[in-house]
């Protein structure tokens, strides 16, 4: 499944262009602009499955760093600071990774 099966290419482009500069990534505005905030729990789970590159059931820090590349191969990697802030926001149980329930809560935040 491709991410464009769930989200529109136009919304993805708008979301990516809003965070092209280093240190400009904001997960709340990204999820809103990309259209994920308005998707069903099932659709959000499918996006989680795409982001969970190693299929471990979690999005780990290295996968988060490449988060934007899941939306477009030409997108930039997140900076270390952006990655750590994103992980801290999503990792509510403190295990160092984001599970599917944590991701759903993060999207709806």
From Swiss-Prot:
Task: Pinpoint the EF-hand domain residues.
Answer: 39-74, 78-109
Between which residues do disulfide bridges form?
none
Binding of Ca(2+) 1 occurs at 52, 54, 56, 58, 60, 63
**GO CC list:** cytoplasm
The entry lists its GO molecular-function terms as: calcium ion binding
Instruction: Indicate which residues the UniProt annotation says bind Ca(2+) 2.
Output: 91, 93, 95, 97, 102
- What ranges does the record give for the region In silico-predicted IgE-binding epitope, renumbered to this chain? 59-66, 76-81, 79-85
What does the UniProt keyword field contain? Answer: Allergen, Calcium, Metal-binding, Muscle protein, Repeat
What is this protein's record name?
Parvalbumin beta
In terms of temperature, how does the activity behave?
Answer: Thermostable between pH 4.0-9.5. Average melting temperature (Tm) across all pH values is 74 degrees Celsius.
The keyword Amino-acid biosynthesis belongs to this UniProt entry's keyword annotation: no
Any Pfam family from its record, for instance, is EF-hand_7
Question: Family per UniProt?
Answer: Belongs to the parvalbumin family.
Q: Please name the SMART domains in this protein's record.
A: EFh
Q: Which InterPro entries match?
A: EF-hand-dom_pair, EF_Hand_1_Ca_BS, EF_hand_dom, Parvalbumin
Q: What does this protein do?
A: In muscle, parvalbumin is thought to be involved in relaxation after contraction. It binds two calcium ions.
Kindly state the tissue distribution recorded for this protein: Expressed in muscle (at protein level).
């Amino acid at each position: 499944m491709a991410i464009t099966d769930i989200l529109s290419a136009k919304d993805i482009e708008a979301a990516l262009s809003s965070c092209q500069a280093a240190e400009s990534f904001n997960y709340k505005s990204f999820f809103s602009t990309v259209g994920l905030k308005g998707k069903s729990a099932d659709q959000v789970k499918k996006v989680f499955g795409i982001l969970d590159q190693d299929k471990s059931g979690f999005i780990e820090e290295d996968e988060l760093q490449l988060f934007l590349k899941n939306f477009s191969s030409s997108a930039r990697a997140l900076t270390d600071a952006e990655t750590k802030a994103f992980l801290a926001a999503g990792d509510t149980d403190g295990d160092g990774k984001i599970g599917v329930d944590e991701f759903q809560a993060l999207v709806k935040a």
